[in-house]
């Protein structure tokens, strides 16, 4: 009986002590990035692991793409640049929720007119539980958006 009671109290502490891994999933839908000849080409996505999002929000797309270290400074923990093919769904990065409070994504399109190119999310707002937590984003012809 004592073992059951102690297990009942210790199990939640164990789960709270374990840090959660958040997967950043990005889905690139068909015809999201048409070039001048109307070919569906891959997009380039840069996923930033951030301590704070203020500098990320204020920065221009060109500054982020060309001089991210100078623009983001110590707020940037890490970044990864990847190309995502049309109709592809990838896990761009897995981050520790306690170490990485924010994730920012910059998408570079062949034609940028009137598209949402930047987005960010708190890792604590990820869906799921434990090791199955995720932040899901979708790239379409309108730009990038978060899917809840």
Residue ranges and their predicted role:
Residues 31, 121-148:
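Extracellular beta-sheet/turn segments enriched in Thr/Pro/Gly and aliphatic residues
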Residues 87-96:
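Exposed aromatic-hydrophobic patches
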Residues 100-111:
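A short, solvent-exposed beta-strand micro-motif common in secreted/extracellular proteins
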Residues 6-15:
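Sec-dependent N-terminal signal peptides
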Residues 38-70:
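Post-signal-peptide N-terminal segment of Sec-exported extracytoplasmic proteins
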Residues 1-5:
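Positively charged n-region of N-terminal signal peptides that target proteins for export
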Residues 26-35:
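Short amphipathic, basic-aromatic surface patches that mediate peripheral association
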